Design a protein with these regions (language model features):
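Extracellular glycan-interacting surfaces
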Residues: 1-181
Length: 181
């Protein structure tokens, strides 16, 4: 059943997500970097005070990745040229911390993660990245074999233990995790 909820955000919605653990938690990131969260299925919204996150790409937007393991953990990504390209919240977006160690100033188009959140993948303007939670750092995945170009999308496919990245003009690139990850 479709039910339109009226709410005036401070800008155009650039990304929207629902918690996979409890879909009554909803998240919005606007094109001007404002983050909003709802705890009641979108009936009421709160803005993160004193926070401006990454803005989105003019055509592609920004990205929100709610954790599938920890209720309240939310990752956001977007333009990181004058601020961090990725942030994380542990409390549904009431406040955020930068998450940029090892990640250069770039534009993050999409985030995805392993089911346990131990690895966060980022499709960026300058290549594919992975954040290792146990090291609290981002690492470039391209090495010598991946195309050197923009990576627009990423999805983690748990059935085959693979992060699948989509590039701009060079096809699909799979990063397969072995049993030691």
């Amino acid at each position: 059943v479709y039910d339109e909820q009226n709410y005036i955000f401070s800008g155009t919605i650039s990304a929207l997500a629902f918690s996979p653990i409890d879909p009554s938690y909803r998240y919005v990131l606007t094109e001007n970097g404002r983050f909003y969260y709802s705890t009641d299925s979108g009936l009421n919204w709160s803005a993160t005070p004193m926070f401006t996150g990454p803005s989105g790409h003019y055509f592609y937007g920004s990205t929100i990745l709610p954790s599938s393991t920890y209720l309240g953990r939310v990752y956001i990504g977007g333009s990181g040229y004058s601020n961090s390209p990725v942030y994380v919240s542990q409390n549904h977006g009431q406040n955020f911390s930068e998450m940029n160690l090892g990640l250069p100033n770039t534009l993050v188009f999409e985030l995805s993660s392993t089911l346990d959140d131990n690895i966060i993948f980022a499709a960026t303007e300058i290549g594919p990245y992975a954040y290792l939670a146990n090291q609290e750092e981002w690492f470039l995945l391209s090495g010598l074999s991946a195309p050197d170009q923009t990576y627009w999308s990423v999805d983690f496919i748990p059935e085959i233990n693979t992060a699948r990245f989509g590039t701009y003009g060079r096809g699909i690139w799979d990063f397969v995790l072995d049993e030691n990850y």
